[in-house]
């Protein structure tokens, strides 16, 4: 008989293998030929169908046939891999969820200045869209929708960008170490 070896988390091909498995499962259970957009990575996916497209809820079959946990969200602004998909006047753009960014900043796992410098580079690269007011305005609306927040978060998002775009400003957010 066949000898099946499970994929180990951390293997070089884990992400690609999970992505392929996700796509196969989605292809088997959803009418993707009707979709206007499909993106997937690892075990996450985002699929957009034209308004009014009818299909059977795929979650029960994805759970039993593919052993996948399935959730269908119907927010005004879609999300993929922790990023909102925002439409500005000129394009679509994936922008990190600022609540998750702040949560990461609150972790106490920063080892030293070198580690902080690496975090700074990553934060700066992935959050560069916060320098665009059109994006910030849409992101504020998205945060309100996703977290049922009634207020406006534009000022908070601008403050977040101020601290992310400058290493010196980022350092002021962190407590000073003794010794």
Curated annotation (Swiss-Prot):
Alphabetical keyword list: ATP-binding, Helicase, Hydrolase, Nucleotide-binding, Nucleotidyltransferase, RNA suppression of termination, RNA-directed RNA polymerase, Transferase, Viral RNA replication
Keyword hit for rRNA processing: no
Disulphide-bonded residues: none
Annotated EC: 2.1.1.-, 2.7.7.48, 3.6.4.13
Catalyzed reactions per annotation: RNA(n) + a ribonucleoside 5'-triphosphate = RNA(n+1) + diphosphate; ATP + H2O = ADP + phosphate + H(+)
Family membership: Belongs to the ssRNA positive-strand viruses RNA-directed RNA polymerase family.
Protein name: Replicase large subunit
Species for this entry: Tobacco rattle virus (strain PSG)
